Structures are given as C-alpha cells and as structure tokens.
C-alpha cells in the first residue's frame, strides 16, 4: 500500500504556520518522498487565519487531497475551522493543556475517533524557551518526535534561514525544537499509526515553488528584460527572476505602475529581446490597451497573470480562476492573443518556456494564467535538461544587416500565407519601421483604406488560424483504457490547477468502474474547438469544473463549439478538492459497481 500522508499547520498569521509547513515539506523531500503543498493566508501582515498543508507520498501526487491525517492547531480558530474535517483516525495536536486559547471538546473527539495530543506550544515557547515567537519550532519538535520526521533536516533549515541573524538566534530555535521533543517524550503515549518512512534513494529532483518555476522558465527561455509593478500574488516572480536574469546580462525594472511595465516590455521586445511582465487581475485590467498595442504592432510579449479573487481588490491572497475573460477577450477591438494555463508547478516551468516560444513564433502577446494557490504550491519536480530545452527554443525570424536582402523587398508587415513576416529591430536590421497602434500597410505606414484594413486584419488573424493543429502538445488527453470510438460514461474538461485536482478524481472513479474521457487543455485561447468536440462526442455528458462563479471556460465551450457542458464551480477562495469533482460525476452518471 502506498504511503500517503497530509500534515496541516493552522493558526494565526504571524505565528509561523507557513514556515512550519515549509520546513516539513523539505524534510519529506529529504526522505525521497513526493510532495505537494497548499498554503493560504490573509492579506493582513499579522493576524487572520493562515494554514500550510503538506501532502507527501512515495507515489506521484496530483492534488492537495481531500483533507488531512494530522492537524496542528495553533489556536482556537484553527480548531473551529478544521473541526468538520476531523474524521475517524485523524490526529489533533493542540496548544494545551495550558497556555493556549482553547480546549477541544474531548467527548466529541472521542466519539469521532479523533486522537488528540496536548502540546503546550505557547507556554513552552514563552516560559521554557523564553521567546513566544518560537511557538512554531516547538510544534516542529513535537512533530519530529511523534511522526518520525528527521530532526536533523529541521536543524539544517534553521541554520540556513537564521544563521545571518547570529548563532544566538539559531540556538534559540534549537532550544524550541528540543522543548517540543522533550514534552512529547515525557508526556505523550503515541496512539496513532502515522510515521514517516525511512529515507529512500534520492531522486534527481529540484524543489520549486510555483512562482519560482515561472522565473526559472523565463530565464531558460532567454528572457532578457523583466518589468513589473509589485502586486500580490505575483511579486515573487520578479524577486526570483532578478537573481537569475541579472546573471545572464538581463535587466529587471520595477515600474511605477502596471501600464508602464507593459510599455517597457513592448519597447524591449521591439528592440529585439525577449521580455516579460507578471501581475494579477487588477494589473491585467490596466494593461489591456497596451496588450492591444502588442497585438496590432505584432510584437512578442509574455504576460503572466497570477490570478486572485476579484473583482477590484477582492481577495489578494486567495485562489481563483476568474481572469479568463479578461485575458482572452478583455481588450477593445479584434486583437490576436494567446492564452495558456499550467496545471502544476512543473508545468509552470515548461509552459513559461512555451509562452516565449509561442510569442516569438506568432508575434503576439501571450498571457500565462496561473493562480494564487499554484504560485505558492511547492513540488519536487524532475530536474530539467536545460541544454535540451534551450536547443529547441524558438526565436523570431529577424532580418539583420549582414543578410543579402533588397531593401525595397523588406516589408515588416508583409502579407504572407501564414500571416507571419520576418521582424526588424533597431540597430540590427538594415531598415527602420514604425511599430504603431494605428492600422497600417505592409510597410508599417498608417493606412485607413478599406481594402488595406481588410487585408491586414485577415493577415493578423491568419497567424493563429491553425494554432490548435500546430500545438497538439498543449492539449493533454487522458482516455484511460478507452480507445477512439469507445463510449464513455462522461467526458470531463478541466484547465489550470483544477485539471490536476480533476486527474485525481478521475483516477478514483476509474477504479470504481467508471469510463471517463478527460481533456486537459493548456491552450485556452484560441479555444481548441476540435479537441473539445472530439472528447465530448465520446459521451452524452460533458462536465467542466472551474474555480469561478460564471463558468468562464464552459461558456467559451458553448461559444466556440456545439457542446453544451454541465458546469461545476467553486468560488470560495480555495481550490476544489478531488472528492467534490468525484461526487459530481457520480451524481451525473449514477452509481457504478466496480467489475
């Protein structure tokens, strides 16, 4: 039986629950386990409910799971919020019997079959360690002793994180770890079955956070200019990228606002280099006119949108998938843009590389839709082969001065069969051109004649008319044991982080005997209509789960295909759990008996 364990730390923002989860995640990866994290915290600097959840397994993990086996409740709110999730066999480690702000209902816990351990985290931190701020380290010491988590890995991380603050700070945290360990040794008799396994052979992996993976992908793709205005939850893309891009003679600029950052990206790309910005929903709203300029002037640009709860300021630190309309059709006029979305941290890396390839190939803006949960999610992914990736990079066709080309034949916006024409760059190319938001002719001069307008509009749209056929690698099929022509019980289409969660639900359903045909498009716009029609034709029911109120991709499916999908939506600021999608499919199809 596979090892699969989820530990959740929950409490008040500022108590160190996020750090506790991060430390535990790294301990699990040290043991050779697969990991997936889920973090959530309020917009306030201190206070409000925060959580960090670490799922670990010796097999591939697709989602954060349905719940947890172990809960560390740092305060009463953490207990109350998670009380409905305390199932038979789960473990509650609570801040008591003294020093905490709550006491659980022991009779209820016993009836539920919940195992409760009292560890006075607050009291030990304050009285024995002498620093209330070390409460989370007391919890980690208790976790180490209770669940066989390697204490040496915790200590290594303390040294790595706090050594710059001095040996006294390191020793203080060590003391807190020891306080938690000793309390468990002297006061708790273990009554649960949960223990981390012994160390397995180390896999060739790297540990990446979602936004960190985007930054690494941009650097590998050859991004030379990054401009952005800080905004939650996208800011760390620039923080990570600044360390990478400067080493490659690149340029990082914090603009005065999102409009300026998009203008800088366009200017940099016009000059001949790859450029990117990252923002969230409010920033996308501000960038719309300039995204239209990149479309009209046919300038490659990569725009990362780390979606958060909206509209307006909304919920800056919470999960959502509600920027699809803004990304795909948010601008005025008929412009060309490509929208893609990763499903996990590994794809955050590879799809960022792909975003640059698409921008360079089709000479248009590419919007990359990730989200708050995926930005913070941590996974151990197979180490990428950087040389192989870079050997396959796509770079814009550029006319340079050393080419033997007749100047009179150089037309930046030449009408071609594909709609794509060679680009020019100042100082590199033998002839200048005007990159303008005005409608223009092949030579880039402003034109408003009806015949030229028709010709140029059709030229620009011709670039993307075959994008689905040319990018089948951006459309992931999962038919299980079904063959082409077989009848499925249901078809499922999911995108973004919801796709990863859907995959786990589909796996469970297949074990129960359900025949599920699944499609997980990374290319969202232009809508991959052929693939959608095909997967929907395999059954009488098509389900589209997504984390927004209106069912934005489901409505795109209705708009661009003959398919009329069933919608399943969450909009609570947290992702689906697999059980929700599993239950909806069972409801739609009816009960099955596993043959």
Where are the regions a protein language model picked out?
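Thiamine diphosphate
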Residues: 3-83, 232-329, 338-359
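A short helix->loop->beta-strand "cap" motif at the edges of active sites that frequently abuts
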Residues: 86-92, 97, 112-114, 250, ...
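Conserved thiamine diphosphate
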Residues: 118-119, 141, 318-365, 391-404, ...
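Short, solvent-exposed amphipathic alpha-helical segments in soluble enzyme
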Residues: 23-26, 87-89, 107-111, 133, ...
